[in-house]
C-alpha cells in the first residue's frame, strides 16, 4: 500500500508581509540614517558651544 502524503500549511500563513505593502513614505538607506544622525549631533554640539554667544 502507498503511504498517504499530507501537505503542511504554507509558512507564514495569515501573517502580514511588510515588503508587499506599497507605502508612500520617504525611503532612506541605513547609511543615510547614520549620516543624518551624525549631522544632527554635530549641529547640536555647535549650537551648544556657539549658541550662548549668539543668543545671549
Curated annotation (Swiss-Prot):
Cytoplasmic side: 1-29
Compartments in which it is found: Cell membrane
Record topological domains on the Extracellular side: 50-56
Protein topology in the membrane: Single-pass membrane protein
Domain of life: Archaea
Keywords of the record: Cell membrane, Membrane, Protein transport, Translocation, Transmembrane, Transmembrane helix, Transport
GO cellular component terms given for this protein: plasma membrane
Transmembrane portions of the chain: 30-49
InterPro entries tied to this protein: Preprot_translocase_SecG, SecG/Sec61-beta/Sbh
GO biological process terms on file: protein transport
Subunit structure comment from the entry: Component of the protein translocase complex. Heterotrimer consisting of alpha (SecY), beta (SecG) and gamma (SecE) subunits. Can form oligomers of the heterotrimer.
HAMAP family linked to this entry: SecG (MF_00751)
Role, per record: Involved in protein export. The function of the beta subunit is unknown, but it may be involved in stabilization of the trimeric complex.
Record family assignment: Belongs to the SEC61-beta family.
Protein name per its UniProtKB record: Preprotein translocase subunit SecG
Amino acid at each position: 500500500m502507498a503511504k498517504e502524503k499530507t501537505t503542511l500549511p504554507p509558512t507564514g500563513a495569515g501573517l502580514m508581509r511588510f515588503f508587499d505593502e506599497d507605502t508612500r513614505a520617504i525611503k532612506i538607506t541605513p547609511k543615510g540614517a547614520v549620516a543624518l544622525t551624525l549631522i544632527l549631533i554635530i549641529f547640536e554640539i555647535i549650537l551648544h558651544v556657539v549658541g550662548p554667544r549668539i543668543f545671549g
